[in-house]
């Protein structure tokens, strides 16, 4: 855990997401008046829902206690994950404790093959927790859940213009007639 110099007087509450310019750092564990305690994602007691960026593959990212290593266990044993894939937060209801779509890290190794009981990937965090200086706390999650943007759009019918009838040479052309005044 680390302490930050913002607390309840600054609007912080328990279970808010903590980030920096590189990605996810952790979550607010406990808030005091002018400070807060943050549990880091690398902490062995830490876990967060994760998703392979650009796909629907989800799993649990857990801290290992090492500053440069996380464990990502896929929920689907047939799921596809490979070295070089980015892992982002899946998100929590109401954005707490984790807002969705935040960068977590890059897959560096995968154990187990598709179809085995479990597939575990080793993830190198984007954030170097040993070099933290300025952090941000997500006080209000995004209005629209970014993970929804990875879902395919519902198919929509493309309107086709209706054909316009044109008179052919064999058809008679109609002419407008104006009624003549009656002598009546």
Give the ranges of each region predicted by the language model:
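A secondary-structure micro-motif
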Residues: 1-184
């Amino acid at each position: 855990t680390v302490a930050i110099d913002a607390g309840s007087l600054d609007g912080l509450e328990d279970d808010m997401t903590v980030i920096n310019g590189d990605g996810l750092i952790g979550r607010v564990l406990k808030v005091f008046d002018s400070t807060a305690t943050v549990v880091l994602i690398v902490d062995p007691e830490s876990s967060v829902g994760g998703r392979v960026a650009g796909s629907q593959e989800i799993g649990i990212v857990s801290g290992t206690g090492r500053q440069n290593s996380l464990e990502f266990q896929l929920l689907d044993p047939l799921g596809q994950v490979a070295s070089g894939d980015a892992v982002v937060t899946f998100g929590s209801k109401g954005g707490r404790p984790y807002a969705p779509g935040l960068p977590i890290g890059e897959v560096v190794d995968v154990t187990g093959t598709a179809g085995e009981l479990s597939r575990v990937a080793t993830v190198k965090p984007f954030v170097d927790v040993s070099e933290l200086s300025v952090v941000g706390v997500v006080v209000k999650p995004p209005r629209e859940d970014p993970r929804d943007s990875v879902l395919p759009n519902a198919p929509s019918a493309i309107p086709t213009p209706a054909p316009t009838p044109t008179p052919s040479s064999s058809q008679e052309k109609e002419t407008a007639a104006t009624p003549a005044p009656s002598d009546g």
